[in-house]
């Protein structure tokens, strides 16, 4: 998920006078941080909540040695079987920890991205759009995002798996910390970064590229944010699926798969994960769940961008209105 802030001025296409102040993309300096964090938190929570059942399916489809009862051919077929055999709420298992992590993680993510992108764009292209600035800003923002989100990812994916032994969120956190130590919550952090840094770099560059073509004046146009976000999510999800498979293995520590690969103890490290995945399924194993991953990411990033841009626009316009009223009522 992600975003954009260029200093290109665009007045609203309404029957009101053209204003000379910055449009919503440029965000007034006094309000930008709070606006970005609020909009980012809301966008992140909605993104993960709306598409969570598909994310649960993706986690199961990436299992290297799935239970015969948990082998699925399609996302729809998987959801139908899970609901029929495990209950209506089963696809939502682990959603609570995801929401707890997504709010602060995305608040930091969007705020960091906007600040770094603006600073780098000023240096590289005098405030104009720069793909280098977009990629670097997205990568740096990812480091902060994943530091907050990684423990939530570990708990979430363990609760999503078929026949998960954990009764609740608290039970999962307690059992993992007792048996594997607190380090277990960050065992996949380096792999997460290895996956998410290229993911976000591709994601932001694709989004900005699409915006340049569909929304060159950087106005608030919801349809362009949805289209650009969906395209960015699909491309970045597809090219990073092999790394996501490795991350899932490190997060879940899938016992059957590790036993088949003769791995004793706990699997750690990207190199070991790559070797294990290849040993168990060859090259095709690196693309397990790619359909579910793309289906999940396309609407997720479209939701994240459209919600983020809406709240950024709404909050900025509200603050501008408050300032205008305050200025008019203040004594001269």
From Swiss-Prot:
Listed PROSITE patterns: SOLCAR (PS50920)
UniProt entry tagged with the keyword Membrane: yes
Residue spans of the Solcar repeats: 31-119, 129-213, 220-314
Catalytic activity: Fe(2+)(in) = Fe(2+)(out)
Tissue: Highly expressed in hematopoietic organs, Expressed in the intermediate cell mass (ICM), a tissue equivalent to the mammalian extraembryonic yolk-sac blood islands. Colocalizes with gata1.
Keywords per UniProt: Ion transport, Iron, Iron transport, Membrane, Mitochondrion, Mitochondrion inner membrane, Repeat, Transmembrane, Transmembrane helix, Transport
Disruption-associated phenotype: Morpholino knockdown results in embryos which are profoundly anemic.
Record carries keyword Iron: yes
Major subcellular site: mitochondrion
Protein function: Mitochondrial iron transporter that specifically mediates iron uptake in developing erythroid cells, thereby playing an essential role in heme biosynthesis.
Family stated for the protein in its record: Belongs to the mitochondrial carrier (TC 2.A.29) family.
The protein's name in its UniProt record: Mitoferrin-1
Biological source species: Danio rerio (Zebrafish)
